Amino acid sequence: MATHILLKNNIMPTDNRPTLAIDTSTSFLSIALEHQSEICLFHENVGTKQSEQILPQIERLFKEAGITAADLGCIVYAQGPGAFTGLRIGAAVAQGLATPFDTPMIGIPCLDAAASLLPPSSCVLAATDARMGEVFYAWFDTQNHVRLSDYTVGKASAIAAPEGQTPSGGIGNAFALADKPPFDGQADMPTAADYLKLARSGRYLATDAAHAELLYVRNKIALTAQEQAQQKAKP
């Protein structure tokens, strides 16, 4: 039987202060700043240079808007699942900016952000590249803002629709893989601006920096070189 999980409800700060969003869950560095009803976005594939570029790009956005970290009303961050190192970089920077000023933080699951790109539907699949021949995925009812399954990692070919549901579409960079999910889908991915929009929906909990958490779905984050070689040798 399918598991129905209601997305959390929480009111986003409404004092109209600037909001920063950070997504480092892939090789892209995506940063968005909402200030005075305008969103400025940096979104670029920087590979392994996220740690080098994230603070300079945030400072550039602050300078262009004429603000500092002390002016932020909230910081939104990509919670996972995604690239382990990238997620840690983004969360650490967000916590570092939030802690001195007690700025609330909102974590948005990456698959939720991907699913939000699709038109409202009763059953859609969000799936992203998890490396090592696997994908992260979850099913969503985007009409009613309900997640229909757990966040899962596994082989794309093994993904099955929730019981009694007919999928209407899929989203995420897993659909660009050679071994992609066995459903129709597009390989689009969210930017930090999409995380801002979800945070503004009020459906995700705000917390202080000390209690901000990441979402992992792998029991073991890293494989040894021997284990990776063994996986590659499998038919």
Predicted regions and their residues:
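Short, conserved active-site loops that position catalytic residues or coordinate cofactors/metal ions
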Residues: 35, 56-58, 79
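A short glycine/serine-rich beta->alpha loop
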Residues: 41-46, 79-83, 183-186
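Generic structural marker for isolated residues within well-ordered, non-membrane alpha-helices
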Residues: 58, 94, 111
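Phosphate/pyrophosphate-binding loops at sites that engage ATP/ADP/AMP, CoA/4′-phosphopantetheine
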Residues: 58-73, 162-167
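DPxDG-like acidic metal-binding loop motif
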Residues: 74-105
